[in-house]
Amino acid sequence: MAEKRNIFLVGPMGAGKSTIGRQLAQQLNMEFYDSDQEIEKRTGADVGWVFDVEGEDGFRNREEKVINELTEKQGIVLATGGGSVKSRETRNRLSARGVVVYLETTIEKQLARTQRDKKRPLLQVEAPPREVLEALANERNPLYEEIADVTIRTDDQSAKVVANQIIHMLESN
């Protein structure tokens, strides 16, 4: 991979986008960004607070702006928020400005990986987490698939193994 293409990780919460993204960036000697962390940095508040105060629409507007700015950079790995693909603009920008890698996982793995995480605003509701995750999957999985250049299942693999798979797939394309 002589020239460094942007690599954008999409997928549901708990798929490993941030962990795998950091590993991938380290292995490729690229800059890593996480859209949720960028929002937190810019607002001085955590994602849950932004969600509570501004609602999902306000949060998504911030997310769209942050992703637009970040995707204009060169040679980065970006872990996007699970719902970022709801925006057609964001989907178009991701597709046009880099390689989109869809990190796929099962509802069971999502439940296991997110059960103690209080920084997941969409799971801080009355409905059972499984039902919430299933509804999100029904809405978002087709959007991830629509823009994915590469799809990798992350269920029982370490971040390093998945990062190596991504590198191998990128080198063979």
Swiss-Prot record:
Pathway recorded for this protein: Metabolic intermediate biosynthesis; chorismate biosynthesis; chorismate from D-erythrose 4-phosphate and phosphoenolpyruvate: step 5/7
Family per record: Belongs to the shikimate kinase family.
Role of this protein: Catalyzes the specific phosphorylation of the 3-hydroxyl group of shikimic acid using ATP as a cosubstrate.
Binding-site positions, substrate: D36, R60, G82, R140
Protein residues bound to ATP: G14, A15, G16, K17, S18, T19, R120, Q157
This protein's UniProt keywords: Amino-acid biosynthesis, Aromatic amino acid biosynthesis, ATP-binding, Cytoplasm, Kinase, Magnesium, Metal-binding, Nucleotide-binding, Transferase
Keyword Kinase: yes
Catalytic activity as recorded in UniProt: shikimate + ATP = 3-phosphoshikimate + ADP + H(+)
Superkingdom of this protein's organism: Bacteria
UniProt: Mg(2+) binding residues: S18
Subcellular location as annotated: Cytoplasm
EC number: 2.7.1.71
Name the UniProt record assigns to this protein: Shikimate kinase 1
Self-association and partners: Monomer.
Record-level Gene Ontology MF annotations: ATP binding; magnesium ion binding; shikimate kinase activity
GO biological process terms held by the UniProt record: amino acid biosynthetic process; aromatic amino acid family biosynthetic process; chorismate biosynthetic process
